[in-house]
């Protein structure tokens, strides 16, 4: 008997949250959360679904129905309008959003048996974003960012194109809240395939993930190439450097011009100026004051 109690203590009861499961769903997609019937029922049990959002600390009642009832409760209006109870007592989430991330669990309560946390799910919403970049040689690249709500480590992310690895020059990064993939064109892409859009997926467990669509590459044919109108980092730095040099030259020119203007009157005052009218006057004046010339007899 003591051994039996020890086993029950170690293994736990069915209503313990041992069935907790992480469910990944892409942003905007639907997901079904099963709630199978407990092994023992007496007909007076009520099945309830609860939700505790990841962004808050409150718990809401999503749906409730009596076990064995032919038509389940359609649910409440408002946020729960996208949540509905199916005929098999599963909870259906339509068009998942970021605020839908959180913990969901079903409970089967009755007079004889209480399955408080019969099934517990941690719903995580996957989302992705796509950016454009340029490599060191000027070739266009794509930056694919895959993240999850609520934030958690993305070490188990795998990047896949079709049924195999991503082609081209790729470099992956993993962080505490997101996973990033840098995709640049390379020799791995064949000519017919490079003219079609590429589908790359960021996959988590159970083949759940986010899909990215990369535009078809047109740089394989020189006739189709068009001059790039984008501003990359080297051109921006060169433009800023040129503008800075122009501003410095203009400032130096203004300073030199001001010094020249200020110094011109000083130089003119130190150099004696020739004035013809004053010189003539002085000659006449000296001639009148001098003694008359002696005439020989």
From Swiss-Prot:
Subcellular compartments: Cell membrane
Protein name: Lymphocyte antigen 6 complex locus protein G6f
PANTHER family the record matches: LYMPHOCYTE ANTIGEN 6 COMPLEX LOCUS PROTEIN G6F
Residue ranges that the Swiss-Prot or TrEMBL entry lists as coiled coil: none
Species in which this protein is naturally found: Homo sapiens
Glycosylation sites: 88
InterPro entries per the UniProt record, alphabetical: Ig-like_dom, Ig-like_dom_sf, Ig-like_fold, Ig_sub, Ig_V-set, LY6G6d/LY6G6f
Cystine connections: 35-106
Coarse class of the protein's main subcellular location: membrane
């Amino acid at each position: 008997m003591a051994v039996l109690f020890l086993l029950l203590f170690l293994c736990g009861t069915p209503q313990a949250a041992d069935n907790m499961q992480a469910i990944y769903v892409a942003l905007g997609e639907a997901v079904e959360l099963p709630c199978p019937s407990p092994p023992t029922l007496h007909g007076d049990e009520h099945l309830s679904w609860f939700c505790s959002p990841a962004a808050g600390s409150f718990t809401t009642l999503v749906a409730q129905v009596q076990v064995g009832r032919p038509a389940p409760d359609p649910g409440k209006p408002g946020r729960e309008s996208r949540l509905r109870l199916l005929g098999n007592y599963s909870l259906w989430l339509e068009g998942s959003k970021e605020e839908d991330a959180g913990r969901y669990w079903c409970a089967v309560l009755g007079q004889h048996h209480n399955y408080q946390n019969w099934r517990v799910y941690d719903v995580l919403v996957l989302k992705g974003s796509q950016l454009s970049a340029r490599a060191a040689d000027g070739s266009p690249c794509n930056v694919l960012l895959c993240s999850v709500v609520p934030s958690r480590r993305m070490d188990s992310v795998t990047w896949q194109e079709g049924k195999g690895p991503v082609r081209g020059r790729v470099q992956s990064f993993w962080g505490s809240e997101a996973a990033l993939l840098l995709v640049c064109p390379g020799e791995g892409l064949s000519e017919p395939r490079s003219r079609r859009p590429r589908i790359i997926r960021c996959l988590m467990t159970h083949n759940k993930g986010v899909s990215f669509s990369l535009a078809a590459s047109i740089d394989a044919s020189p006739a189709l190439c068009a001059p790039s109108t984008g501003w990359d980092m080297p051109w921006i730095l060169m433009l800023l450097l040129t503008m800075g040099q122009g501003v410095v030259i203009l400032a130096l020119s203004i300073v030199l011009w001001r010094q020249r203007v200020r110094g011109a009157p000083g130089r003119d005052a130190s150099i004696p100026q020739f004035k013809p009218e004053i010189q003539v006057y002085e000659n006449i004046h000296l001639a009148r004051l001098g003694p008359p010339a002696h005439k020989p007899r």
